[in-house]
Amino acid sequence: MKEKVVLAYSGGLDTTAIIPWLKETFDYEVICCCIDCGQGNELVGLDERAKLSGASKLYIENVIDEFSEDFIMPCVKAGAVYENKYLLGTSMARPVIAKKLVEIARKEGAVAICHGATGKGNDQIRFELGIKALAPDIKVIAPWRMTDVWTMQYREDELAYCKAHGIDLPFDANHSYSRDRNLWHISHEGLELEDPSNEPNYDDLLVLTTPPEKAPDEGEYVTMTFEAGVPKTLNGKEMKVSEIITELNKLGGKHGIGIVDIVENRVVGMKSRGVYETPGGTILMAAHEQLEELILDRETLKTKKDLGNLLAEVVYEGKWYTPLREAIQAFVDVTQKYVTGEVKFKLFKGNIIKAGESSPYSLYNESLASFTTGDLYDHHDADGFITLFGLPLKVRAMKMQELEKNNNK
């Protein structure tokens, strides 16, 4: 009986070419596994394609709800954004994919897991750190780093290899954008984006989102409610998290929300440029933040922001299955206990405009915030506070005056 390998399979040219290569190079039985994180119609026809390419079996695992609730929401609650722009769409998906690959490898008794990530990108790190953390005994095969036996460098090479092995599938020989899509976002790299001086060709590029200048001339109001930091209703209708994200994608896409052009610092040291469409995610993050500012005290909000930035780095670097990620998430979960309430905002030509928020746990006190005198706050109380709060500044200034006077003698 042949040993088995589980291949992370997308149905694209790279992973299709890997199937006969694994059989030819290692004499493995190839079990393909496609993890459905919300790719949509990209999954159509995969079973036939995998088997025509030589796989003995294809698993299509729907993890959309798990991805939404256990991977997306911890990052939303933390406000995790990498380098102030990137909402971690690809980064959050890789650990759930790694988890399912390991589960299927265990079920099939496979000795190895194979992925098609290149040797220059972040995904190789994310996949392999996840697999190492969950199954240190399982071998990982990364063809693009095995240049002694993987000789295909270009798309044309892969097409020729497939054809030579009897795989005649309708792959496009032309170069196109490199895209990664899931429920949360779609990323675009390649072509004109490789030169950061070029403006993206948005008419050809965008998939989910209308360019803001072409969005409707009339704004649209949206209302959301949250319980303990988790979205529960959208425009009065109760939904699962995944359903809310799906609907927000439609609304945000219609109004040109969530297009980001970023030059980011990859884990491997190089800079890369990409355009990300995250319409629903951008709205959800903004709505959650809008409610938090009403509820969390200053020091908690500040500390949470710092840890949110740290979590973004941890997730981006593929360190989901670590004590550090668990510890950050535990802190964030405590802060979310009272993040309950309603937010309202208007979507208009790429903008999310606040239109009110309320919460039974709001720390906003109108009598305190107003400029009139109230029972809870006496303007005279500020005298003592400013004296003490400014004491270090005053002491330093006095010392500087003393030193200057002595120097002038």
Please tell me what each predicted stretch does.
Residues 2-409:
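Nucleotide-activated chemistry modules centered on ATP-dependent adenylation/adenylyltransferase
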